[in-house]
Curated annotation (Swiss-Prot):
Its cofactor is Mg(2+); K(+). The gene is metK. This is S-adenosylmethionine synthase. It holds the Pfam family S-AdoMet_synt_N. GO terms for biological process: one-carbon metabolic process; S-adenosylmethionine biosynthetic process. K(+) binds at residue 50. HAMAP family: S_AdoMet_synth1 (MF_00086). Catalyzes the formation of S-adenosylmethionine (AdoMet) from methionine and ATP. The overall synthetic reaction is composed of two sequential steps, AdoMet formation and the subsequent tripolyphosphate hydrolysis which occurs prior to release of AdoMet from the enzyme. ATP binds at residues 22, 180-182, 246-247, 255, 261-262, 278, 282.
Length: 406
């Protein structure tokens, strides 16, 4: 996919985001709130928490092995309240919704490989080999020089618009807004560089007595214009605000939500490939989550060190085995070093075994709920360990030594 865009001198690329009040994002936040509550008390707990929301009902289910107890219904209602579903007229609120739970222990067959990896069973004594990957699969990380946070511009702007939509609702700037909402940004690229914004789409849930004309004018003035750089807007930029003309019924009343249904919103907005695994509700032994974070960490530090303008890394695992099956990279013809040398730098500076990832990034902490809306990656307002650029100097030193040796 990326090669198709890269071979065209002019193309459009679109990414979307959703607000914290979107039904799928309600579920992600609940699942990660449960994870945080458990991991705060029991850092080595195994958690796979799924949530579904629908009209008047929340169902929390999954497989959890832990020594602690958390009051899940109380957590659920707290998340719903924090999001802003607090009025009965919304049709779904924190006080009246039903909460059902169905929690089992993690399968002992899975635990056999996670708690004692294949390497450990063979007699290897390195403690970082003890934890096996929690599942098979492939995970991707990506970084580019397009934005200060090393994220693609379309998803970066879409997230900022969604956050702004929630902000003007919560601070009273646009008090008639309700929690559900979406954003979408289409960027026009010329020779791989962002040239202009082709279109901006906003869906904003609202009270019934507000006119479409007022909503459109308010959203453009208070949401779009403060976020989109003026140098990327022109007279041809198209704005679509509540394109159906009405968005009163929203949230779980209008759409059933599930954990893990917004995986491209959570990552790169489709600009990079995705292995298919979701993040929220999963403890860090699940490489769906932790290896994606690590892959982002690697890609971001490599790009920041000047090795490429765009870099995508794939890592693959087998359940119960600590060492990855494969590591590969794609630099989209932007690399300043051959791929073999870049892979050697990755091997030198980054340990991709699950236990090493968990320890090096400090993942056995309650840091996950804050990532469950507005993206897990490229969040400059959060101190996320996989977003740190603390390997850049060491990478540059290795680049220098490789240059000298040649």
């Amino acid at each position: 996919m990326s090669q198709t865009f890269g071979n065209s001198s002019k193309y459009l690329f679109t990414s979307e985001s959703v607000t914290e009040g979107h039904p799928d994002k309600i579920c992600d936040q609940i699942s990660d709130a449960v994870l945080d509550a458990i991991i705060a008390k029991d850092p080595t707990a195994h958690v796979a928490c799924e949530t579904a929301v629908t009209n008047g009902l929340v169902v929390v289910m999954g497989e959890i092995t832990t020594s602690c107890y958390v009051e899940i219904p109380e957590l659920v209602r707290g998340v719903i309240k924090d999001i802003g579903y607090i009025k009965p007229e919304y049709g779904f609120d924190d006080r009246t919704c039903g909460v059902l739970t169905s929690i089992n222990r993690q399968s002992p067959d899975i635990a056999l490989g996670v708690n004692k990896s294949q390497e450990a069973k063979s007699g290897q004594v390195d403690e970082l080999d003890l934890t096996g990957a929690g599942d098979q699969g492939m995970m991707f990380g990506y970084a580019c020089t397009e934005t200060p946070e090393y994220m693609p511009l379309p998803i970066s702007l879409a997230h900022r618009l969604s956050k702004r939509l929630a902000e003007v609702r919560k601070n009273g700037t646009l008090p008639y807004l309700r929690p559900d909402g979406k954003s979408q940004v289409t960027v026009e690229y010329h020779n791989g560089k962002a040239k202009r914004i082709s279109s901006v789409v906003i869906g904003a849930q609202h009270d019934p007595d507000i006119t479409t004309e007022k909503i459109q004018a308010d959203i453009i003035r208070e949401v779009i214009k403060p976020i989109i750089p003026t140098n990327l807007l022109d007279e041809k930029t198209e704005y679509y605000v509540n394109a159906t003309g009405r968005f009163v019924v929203g949230g779980p009343v209008s759409d059933t939500g599930f954990t893990g249904r917004k995986i491209l919103v959570d990552t790169y907005g489709g600009f990079a490939r995705h292995g298919g695994g979701a993040f929220s509700g999963k403890d860090p032994t699940k490489v769906d989550r932790s290896a994606c974070y690590m892959a982002r960490y690697i890609a971001k530090n490599l790009v920041a060190a000047g090795l490429a303008d765009r870099l995508e890394i794939q890592v693959a695992y087998v359940i119960g085995v600590a060492h990855p099956l494969s590591v590969s990279i794609e630099t989209f013809n932007t690399a300043r070093m051959n791929h073999e040398d870049i892979l050697s730098i990755i091997q030198k500076h980054f340990d991709l075994r699950p236990e090493a990832i968990i320890r090096n990034l400090g993942l056995r902490r309650p840091i996950y709920r804050q990532t469950a809306a507005y993206g897990h990656l490229g969040r400059p307002e959060l101190d996320l360990p996989w977003e740190r650029l603390d390997k850049v100097d060491a990478i540059k030193a290795t680049i220098e030594s490789l240059s000298v040796s040649k």
